[in-house]
């Protein structure tokens, strides 16, 4: 099973106090954000949800007017749509990925936290409910400890109590009027699960050539696989793409792995929305030997600089036009925090203790081997629509608790 939770915080303060939309727009947003994040964090893990960010920015657009709204629409790739048409698309897409009949679970929960006594336009509240199913809560931000506890409890309740301490009291003060919280929860079983008894301790070699010991899962099975050229002569100029579906085949994790001799940084500049589509269209179902780390990645991102780099700047200054949200013309967005957590394992959040190990060989085989023992790029996507739900990379896999497992080193 793989579990992924994604959580976003947007805080508003007062100074005086191909594919078609939305898939195409989200694909472009995904790649642009990824490139910005890798430029500012050379050797760090990356994890974010472009879907979550698109929904959060849709909420901000609902409250924006004039040049502020125009800037958001342009940066999000909505220029080809009629004004406001994007909200219907976002609502339909959100409803599709959270459908109860799906074989995976994906919940998107939104809430607007409002300072007691502060006026928010009724039409804005109605539109928030209509398009984003967003609730509204009144709080006293001057009581920052109580507010932080309240919001953290809300996040826990909407993520099966798996994520705690999203915000801290220092995120709020008496000048804070509004906080917009967006939480996404995803959980899915692999279509072909990894057997826990096949997991072994394995060396993961980082780009600086240091090594860390991690639990390495293993299975042979039929997966979507392809080899692609990176245009260089290093290590044959070939990299691997493996797509592992979740139950139901609608959602999958796509792994992109350079040859071990080639740092991931050499491959990353190639990543474009069109290339992601090419990978999806070119991989073929075949038998593959897969060695995949059992790992967790957790990351908190300050979205303010990232969004500014993408062209969204006005919402962060005192001249922001958010009069669709409130008649208070002094209001602007002061903080944007995006926190994500990813856990990938054999079959669940707690793998069963086992004994009786099965030997695993790295000798010659008749079909491809994908040995994920060095940094890799990944995304989680809807295979039917092509929509990217999550994107990231693993440079430093954090070892999960292996207590109770009799691992044997390969």
From Swiss-Prot:
GO cellular component term of the entry, any: cytoplasmic vesicle lumen
MF annotations from Gene Ontology: serine-type endopeptidase inhibitor activity
Substitution effect: residue 340 to A: Increases protein stability and decreases tendency to form polymers. No effect on inhibitory activity
Membrane-spanning residues: none
A biological process from GO: central nervous system development
Effect listed in the UniProt record for changing residue 161 to G: Increases protein stability and abolishes tendency to form polymers. No effect on inhibitory activity
Site (Reactive bond): 362-363
Classification via InterPro entries: Serpin_CS, Serpin_dom, Serpin_fam, Serpin_sf, Serpin_sf_1, Serpin_sf_2
Outcome of substituting residue 289 to A: Slightly decreases inhibitory activity. No effect on thermal stability
Residues that carry a glycan: 157, 321, 401, 403
Compartment list: Secreted; Cytoplasmic vesicle, Secretory vesicle lumen; Perikaryon
Database matches in CDD domains: serpinI1_NSP (cd02048)
Keywords for this protein: Cytoplasmic vesicle, Disease variant, Glycoprotein, Neurodegeneration, Protease inhibitor, Proteoglycan, Secreted, Serine protease inhibitor, Signal
Signal sequence range: 1-16
Role according to the record: Serine protease inhibitor that inhibits plasminogen activators and plasmin but not thrombin. May be involved in the formation or reorganization of synaptic connections as well as for synaptic plasticity in the adult nervous system. May protect neurons from cell damage by tissue-type plasminogen activator.
Quaternary data: Monomer. Has a tendency to form large polymers already at 41 and 45 degrees Celsius (in vitro).
Family under the similarity heading: Belongs to the serpin family.
PANTHER family, sorted: NEUROSERPIN, SERINE PROTEASE INHIBITOR, SERPIN
Protein name: Neuroserpin
Organism of provenance: Homo sapiens (Human)
Species lineage: Eukaryota, Metazoa, Chordata, Craniata, Vertebrata
């Amino acid at each position: 099973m793989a579990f992924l939770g994604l959580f976003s915080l947007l805080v508003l303060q007062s100074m005086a106090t191909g594919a078609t939309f939305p898939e195409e727009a989200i694909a472009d947003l995904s790649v642009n954000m990824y490139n910005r994040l890798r430029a500012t964090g050379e050797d760090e893990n990356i994890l974010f949800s472009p879907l979550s960010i698109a929904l959060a920015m849709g909420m901000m657009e609902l409250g924006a007017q004039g040049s502020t709204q125009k800037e958001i629409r342009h940066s999000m790739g909505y220029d080809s749509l009629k004004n406001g048409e994007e909200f219907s698309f976002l609502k339909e897409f959100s409803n599709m990925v959270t459908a109860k009949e799906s074989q995976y679970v994906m919940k998107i929960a939104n809430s607007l936290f409002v300072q007691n006594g502060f006026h928010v336009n009724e039409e804005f509240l109605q539109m928030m409910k209509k398009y984003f199913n967003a609730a509204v809560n009144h709080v006293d931000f001057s009581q920052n400890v109580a507010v932080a506890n309240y919001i953290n409890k809300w996040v826990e309740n909407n993520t099966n109590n798996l994520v705690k301490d999203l915000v801290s009291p220092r995120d709020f003060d008496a000048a804070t009027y509004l906080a917009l919280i967006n939480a996404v929860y995803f959980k899915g079983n692999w279509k072909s699960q990894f057997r826990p008894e096949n997991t072994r301790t394995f060396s993961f070699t980082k780009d600086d050539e240091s090594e860390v010991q991690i639990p390495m899962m293993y299975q042979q099975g039929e997966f979507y696989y392809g080899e692609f050229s990176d245009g260089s002569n290093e290590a044959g100029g070939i990299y691997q793409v493996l797509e592992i579906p979740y139950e139901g085949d609608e959602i999958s994790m796509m792994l992109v792995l350079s040859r071990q001799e080639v740092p991931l940084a050499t491959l990353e500049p190639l990543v474009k929305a069109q290339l992601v589509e090419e990978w999806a269209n070119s991989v073929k179902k075949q038998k593959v030997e897969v060695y995949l780390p059992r790992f967790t990645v957790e990351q908190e991102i300050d979205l303010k600089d990232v969004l500014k780099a993408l062209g969204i700047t006005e919402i962060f200054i005192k001249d922001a036009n958010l009069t669709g949200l409130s008649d208070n013309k002094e209001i602007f967005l002061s903080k944007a925090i995006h926190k994500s957590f990813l856990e990938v394992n054999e079959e669940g959040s707690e793998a069963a203790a086992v004994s009786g190990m099965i030997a695993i060989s790295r000798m010659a085989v008749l079909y491809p081997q994908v040995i994920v023992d060095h940094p890799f790029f990944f995304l989680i996507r809807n295979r039917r629509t092509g929509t990217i739900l999550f994107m990231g990379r693993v440079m430093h896999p954090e070892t999960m608790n292996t207590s109770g497992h009799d691992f044997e080193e390969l």
